[in-house]
């Protein structure tokens, strides 16, 4: 018996993934810095177990892996989903903001992967690193976030190169807009600026040029993560999987033509 570990498991994609895996019969350990949302998610399913820890803290994540292994016999998979947003250009980003953004979006994944590697080798397990389409392109005034999400893809490729022959699979997942509490906050920025009258209208605005014409539900991204963790994807390794409703295939200069 083994379990999956999900960082950033208290809300959004992490919480949806925990529920999906638990519904499939897997034990799941969700990790985050805030106890309240973790406990709320854990209360929804007997197979979801909460541990409050900072995923960027090496000692804390080593303890999470040790506790998971002691209780469940090993680690079957890791979902590195912790992250955070921020708004600034390179010129307006302070040293502290830069460090904070990289810690939230890159260091958390590095530390979690490093902590879990030995157990994942033992179980021949899988890792999914949740990046973003911000890891493939750049939005405005999101310097730290954009750099961190790009760097995650490099991290995935490095681990894939070094640990594939040791039995560990790893892939990056780049979602587009997903309906999560963090995205709701970003929609609220558009509302406050007067670009949209409400959050729903803001989602419609940001997905106007997405070929599927909508944001994803967190469950749709969770299903992609479950696929990448599972036996149907055993030859998918070191890949960057994009789940964005088609937004990154759009030829932007042709938008004027409809």
What do these predicted regions represent?
Residues 10-12:
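Conserved glycine-rich cofactor-binding loop
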Residues 79, 164, 169, 236-238:
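Short, small/polar-rich loop/turn modules that mediate ligand/substrate recognition or access, typified
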Residues 89-90, 97-102, 206:
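Substrate-binding pocket helix/loop in short-chain dehydrogenase/reductase
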Residues 110, 214-243, 248-249:
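C-terminal substrate-recognition "lid" of short-chain dehydrogenase/reductases
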Residues 113, 148, 156:
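Active-site helix of classical SDR
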Residues 118, 161-165, 234:
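Alpha-helical segment proximal to the catalytic Tyr-Lys
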Residues 132:
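Residue(s) in the substrate-gating loop at a strand-loop-helix junction
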């Amino acid at each position: 018996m083994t379990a999956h570990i999900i960082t950033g498991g208290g809300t959004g994609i992490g919480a949806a993934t925990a529920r999906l895996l638990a519904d499939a019969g897997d034990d799941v350990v969700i990790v985050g810095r805030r106890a309240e949302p973790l406990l709320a998610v854990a209360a929804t399913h007997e197979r979801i177990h909460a541990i409050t820890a900072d995923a960027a803290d090496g000692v804390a994540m080593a303890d999470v892996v040790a506790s998971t292994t002691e209780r469940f016999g090993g680690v079957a998979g890791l979902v590195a989903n912790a992250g955070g947003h921020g708004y600034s250009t390179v010129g307006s980003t302070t040293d502290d903001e830069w460090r904070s953004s990289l810690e939230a979006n890159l260091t958390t994944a590095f530390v979690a992967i490093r902590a879990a590697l030995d157990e994942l080798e033992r179980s021949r397990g899988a890792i999914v690193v949740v990046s973003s389409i911000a890891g493939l392109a750049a939005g405005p005034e999101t310097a730290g976030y954009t750099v961190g999400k790009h760097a995650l893809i490099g991290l995935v490729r490095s681990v894939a190169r070094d640990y594939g022959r040791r039995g560990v699979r790893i892939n990056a997942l780049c979602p587009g807009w997903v309906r999560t509490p963090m995205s709701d906050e970003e929609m609220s920025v558009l509302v406050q600026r007067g670009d949209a009258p409400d959050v729903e209208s803001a989602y419609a605005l940001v997905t106007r040029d997405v070929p599927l014409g909508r944001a994803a539900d967190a469950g749709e991204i969770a299903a992609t993560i479950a696929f990448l963790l599972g036996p149907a994807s055993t030859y998918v390794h070191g890949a960057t999987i994009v789940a964005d409703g088609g937004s990154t295939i759009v030829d932007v200069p042709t938008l004027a033509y409809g």
